[in-house]
């Protein structure tokens, strides 16, 4: 999958929008993303066509 940048709702910003980089798709609507150097999970909501990145509880530790 080719990486791409997109705006997303960020958990640590209380849902405010910021730019993320989508790195990989790991499920039907589950993605690995990078937000300011932090790899975390993000969900894509097909009803509103927006990403929701969880940079608090969804952090991926390598």
Predicted regions and their residues:
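Acidic, low-complexity, intrinsically disordered interaction modules
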Residues: 9-57
